[in-house]
Design a protein with these regions (language model features):
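Exposed, interaction-prone extracellular/peripheral surfaces
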Residues: 2-56, 69-74, 83, 92-128, ...
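N-terminal low-complexity, intrinsically disordered segments
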Residues: 77-87
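Acidic, metal-associated active-site segment
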Residues: 66
Length: 319
């Protein structure tokens, strides 16, 4: 058993993101890994807007669930006459019905993600996360749509329940990823708040919305947009980052450049290192507290993480 688990783990690690650019073949191969992922757990339905998960309804459905005492309002066609005759008390059959829930996947491919100090760039990590979610949604029979956005353009993928929708998303991820060539954005680059505003137009009520980004420009205006989104959609934020953004440890000064100007940073100074670390923690703390206030899920993955293993820990299908 341990040998099998080790073999599976090694196979999954082979699918983890690597390098500065995403490879389409690797994104396609994630289909085999995503078969073990389940995005949604079964729960009782609250309204007709719920979908993409197994929900409980009175009356005829897909799968037989259980028999219980007849209640006022039950469909008489669902009465279990055998149990009723045996007990002399009316009983009703309950069924489970598969309710559709479109899944929208928004993936950030702006310049700020074109960075990585180990294993892979943030932009590559984001493409792998988005691809895993898309394949998992397809395996669950959901409609898949989304948006891939860069600094100056974006591509909307209309929701469809087919492999073609996933393939379109993967091709757009690959195309946008390979357009990146610098971590420095132009002054008129697309902002996250504008993308979230578009999300309110694109994502339909009752859908599940996954947003993959480094959220470097997340602010109170973004929170306002998310507040409106979260009223009608099930939002999950997926934050990607690199360890070098989290902490900067160096015994020597480092030089940075935007391609025109060059600046030397006192990275060997303890006060500078602490201020650098505090800036990252403060921003992530604001993002985390914002998600809590809105009642939405926030997940974080680093470029050095074993992504496939961590996705299974979060979205493991129940055997």
């Amino acid at each position: 058993m341990q040998q099998t688990d080790l073999k599976t783990r090694n196979q999954l690690e082979h699918l983890n993101p690597k390098g500065a650019y995403a490879e389409l073949g690797n994104l396609l191969r994630l289909r085999f890994a995503a078969k073990d992922l389940r995005l949604f757990a079964p729960r009782a339905v609250k309204s007709q807007l719920n979908g993409a998960e197994r929900t409980r309804f009175r009356g005829r459905g897909m799968d037989f669930e259980e028999v219980r005492l007849y209640q006022a309002g039950d469909d008489v066609r669902s009465i279990d006459w055998r149990v009723t005759a045996r007990t002399q008390v009316p009983h009703t059959k309950l069924y489970r019905e598969e309710r559709e829930r479109p899944v929208y996947i928004f993936v950030d491919q702006r310049a700020s993600l074109f960075f990585g100090s180990q294993h892979c760039f943030k932009s590559v990590l984001a493409t792998h996360i988005g691809s895993n979610i898309a394949w998992a949604a397809l395996n669950n029979g959901d409609r898949i749509g989304g948006l891939v956005f860069g600094d100056n353009n974006q591509r909307d993928i209309k929701p469809r329940r087919s492999k073609h929708a996933v393939l379109e998303l993967l091709h757009q991820l690959h195309e946008f990823n390979h357009q990146l060539n610098s971590p420095i954005a132009s002054p008129d680059a697309k902002t996250l708040v504008s993308v979230l505003s578009d999300a309110r137009r694109i994502a339909k009520p009752g859908c599940a919305l996954f947003i993959v980004s480094d959220f470097h420009d997340y602010d109170q205006f973004c929170e306002q947009q998310l507040f409106e989104l979260a009223r009608h959609t099930d939002v999950t934020l997926i934050h990607v980052f690199d360890p070098l953004e989290q902490a900067l440890k160096s015994n020597a000064r480092l030089s940075v450049s935007d391609g025109v100007n060059r600046l030397q940073l006192p990275t060997d100074n303890a006060d500078f290192q602490q201020a650098y670390e505090n800036a990252f923690n403060d921003h992530v703390g604001f993002l985390s507290n914002s998600a809590k206030r809105l009642g939405i899920t926030l997940l974080s993955y680093a470029t050095v993480d074993n992504l496939q293993l961590m996705l299974r820990e979060r979205f493991a299908a129940k055997k």
